[in-house]
């Protein structure tokens, strides 16, 4: 397993879906993360990037779907998601970054 030092290499992208958008009200955020990262690395990276206090981290490995192509079958890549719950007094994360 390779060591990942930069927090922006661990957190790849936020997951924007109906379910994850509904969880934002409960201070729960979902991110696509590097497949080799662990919960401790994810927690430290979120705290450094967004300057918040993380309460808990859950991870889920998602297998890539098998898809048909013109010449046969291909496979989408597998991903890892992190469901991050922020501490009670923590400020919310601005995922969209729109200037006011």
Curated annotation (Swiss-Prot):
Cellular compartments per GO CC: ribonucleoprotein complex; ribosome
InterPro entries: Nucleotide-bd_a/b_plait_sf, Ribosomal_uL23-like, Ribosomal_uL23/eL15/eS24_sf, Ribosomal_uL23_CS
Keyword ATP-binding on entry: no
Keyword set, alphabetical order: Ribonucleoprotein, Ribosomal protein, RNA-binding, rRNA-binding
GO terms of biological process kind: translation
Highest taxon in the source lineage: Bacteria
UniProt-listed Pfam families: Ribosomal_L23 (PF00276)
GO function term, MF aspect, one: structural constituent of ribosome
Keyword rRNA-binding: yes
Coiled-coil stretches noted in the UniProt entry, renumbered to this chain: none
Family: Belongs to the universal ribosomal protein uL23 family.
Function: One of the early assembly proteins it binds 23S rRNA. One of the proteins that surrounds the polypeptide exit tunnel on the outside of the ribosome. Forms the main docking site for trigger factor binding to the ribosome.
Known partners and oligomeric status: Part of the 50S ribosomal subunit. Contacts protein L29, and trigger factor when it is bound to the ribosome.
Protein name as it appears in the record: Large ribosomal subunit protein uL23
Organism: Mycolicibacterium smegmatis (strain ATCC 700084 / mc(2)155)
Record gene name: rplW
């Amino acid at each position: 397993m390779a060591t990942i030092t930069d927090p922006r290499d661990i957190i790849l992208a936020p997951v924007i879906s109906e379910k994850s958008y509904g969880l934002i009200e409960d201070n729960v955020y979902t991110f696509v993360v590097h497949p080799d990262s662990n919960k401790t690395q994810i927690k430290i990276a979120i705290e450094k990037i967004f300057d918040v206090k993380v309460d808990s981290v859950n991870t889920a490995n998602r297998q890539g779907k098998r898809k048909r192509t013109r010449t046969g079958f291909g496979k989408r890549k597998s991903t890892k998601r992190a469901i991050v719950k922020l501490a009670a007094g923590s400020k919310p994360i601005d995922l969209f970054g729109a200037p006011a």
